[in-house]
From Swiss-Prot:
Function text: Catalyzes the methyl esterification of L-isoaspartyl residues in peptides and proteins that result from spontaneous decomposition of normal L-aspartyl and L-asparaginyl residues. It plays a role in the repair and/or degradation of damaged proteins.
Protein's name in the database: Protein-L-isoaspartate O-methyltransferase
Residue numbers annotated as active site: S60
UniProt KW keywords: Cytoplasm, Methyltransferase, S-adenosyl-L-methionine, Transferase
InterPro entries: PCMT, SAM-dependent_MTases_sf
EC annotation from Swiss-Prot or TrEMBL: 2.1.1.77
Localization per record: Cytoplasm
Organism: Methanococcus maripaludis (strain C7 / ATCC BAA-1331)
Length: 212
């Protein structure tokens, strides 16, 4: 990994107040983003911008991954669900934060991306990440309940199944909307859901039975 490039990017994110937690900084410094994108795009791996990975999908900008990890309040040992694996990069960053005692389940609906992300994550040694082929809008009951759930595509609202699979005290982070999207944070407290608007964002659409 080109250390100078990633150090520069992370330094800018810290200076701009995007990331503050040392665990998030360490994870972003550790995960080799260039391994998760097409070889033809590798020279752009450490530019803080979304990049196309094929099939109409993107790998999120580094700052967005950092913001989402911060807002999820991730910690060691947590059980996490990701809806929308894409390249697998975001799941790898989360895996670094929750550690070997934590678990990350990530669901991808596009078979080619499922196969590629699964292969890369295995090659890089992320044994606590399980990649599942399926409709992420239904969640993944088998590994629930989850301490944290995040969605990497924007839907009309958050699928009910995700709230049902969330532990009490758990957090869901998801972009909501079609053309104009808002990153929303939901917290489940004693069975009730409390929501908070965070910032305006732009994600690919959430496709599935409970999406678009």
């Amino acid at each position: 990994m080109p250390l100078n490039e990633i150090v520069g990017v992370i330094g800018n994110l810290i200076s701009n107040g995007y990331i503050k937690k040392q665990s998030v900084i360490d994870a972003l410094m550790t995960v080799p983003r260039h391994k998760f994108i097409p070889k033809s795009m590798e020279e752009y791996a450490y530019i803080d911008s979304p990049l196309g990975i094929g099939y109409g999908q993107t790998i999120s900008a580094i700052h967005m991954v950092g913001i989402m990890c911060e807002e999820l309040d991730l910690d060691v040992g947590q059980n996490v669900l990701e809806v929308g694996t894409g390249s697998g990069y975001h799941a790898a960053v989360v895996s670094e934060i929750v550690g070997e005692s934590g678990n990350v389940t990530t669901i991808e609906r596009i078979p080619e991306l499922f196969e590629k992300s699964k292969q890369v994550l295995l090659e890089l040694g992320y044994e606590n990440v399980e990649v599942v082929l399926g409709d992420g809008t239904k969640g993944y009951l088998e590994n629930s309940p989850y301490d944290r759930i995040y969605v990497t595509a924007s839907g009309p609202d958050v699928p009910k199944a995700l709230f049902e699979q969330l532990n009490d005290g758990g957090i869901i982070l998801a972009p909501v909307g079609s053309h104009f999207q808002t990153l929303m944070r939901y917290k489940k407290i004693h069975g009730k859901i409390f929501e908070e608007k965070l910032l305006e964002v732009a994600f690919v659409p959430l496709i599935g039975e409970n999406g678009f």
